[in-house]
């Protein structure tokens, strides 16, 4: 069984047992978190699809928090001897999907 969930403004296709990185969540490592905004559920019988499936949820365990690799930004003005360098490291939360519960379409 798989599901499409929404967190941090992004959509993720997940299955039980998978580990993935999502935008930073304010939950301590080792705690459980429940995602209620599920857009799609799928299994061998077919799919359930909708804006938000009523009663559907995905539970996950927070494995760790961290920061992604550095992205380097360079702004350059030609012929003006001007260059600006900047770096950014995005915070993320690594989660492990522990369960997917089905629901009815809203």
UniProtKB/Swiss-Prot annotation:
Superkingdom classification of source: Bacteria
Listed PROSITE patterns: RIBOSOMAL_L21
rRNA-binding as UniProt keyword: yes
Gene Ontology molecular functions: rRNA binding; structural constituent of ribosome
Key words, A-Z: Ribonucleoprotein, Ribosomal protein, RNA-binding, rRNA-binding
A single cellular component GO annotation: ribosome
GO terms, biological process: translation
Known role: This protein binds to 23S rRNA in the presence of protein L20.
Summary of subunit composition and partner proteins: Part of the 50S ribosomal subunit. Contacts protein L20.
Family, as annotated: Belongs to the bacterial ribosomal protein bL21 family.
Protein name listed in UniProt: Large ribosomal subunit protein bL21
Organism expressing this protein natively: Xanthomonas campestris pv. campestris (strain ATCC 33913 / DSM 3586 / NCPPB 528 / LMG 568 / P 25)
Taxonomy of the source species: Bacteria, Pseudomonadati, Pseudomonadota, Gammaproteobacteria, Lysobacterales
Gene name for this UniProt entry: rplU
């Amino acid at each position: 069984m798989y599901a499409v969930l929404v967190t941090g403004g992004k959509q993720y296709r997940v299955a039980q047992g998978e580990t993935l990185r999502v935008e930073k969540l304010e939950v301590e490592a080792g705690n459980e978190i429940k995602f209620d905004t599920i857009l799609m559920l799928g299994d061998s019988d077919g799919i359930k699809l909708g804006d938000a499936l009523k009663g559907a949820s995905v539970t996950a365990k927070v494995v760790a928090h961290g920061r992604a690799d550095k992205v380097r930004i360079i702004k350059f003005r030609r012929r003006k001897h001007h260059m600006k360098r900047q770096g950014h490291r995005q915070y993320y939360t690594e989660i492990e999907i522990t369960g997917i519960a089905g629901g009815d379409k809203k």
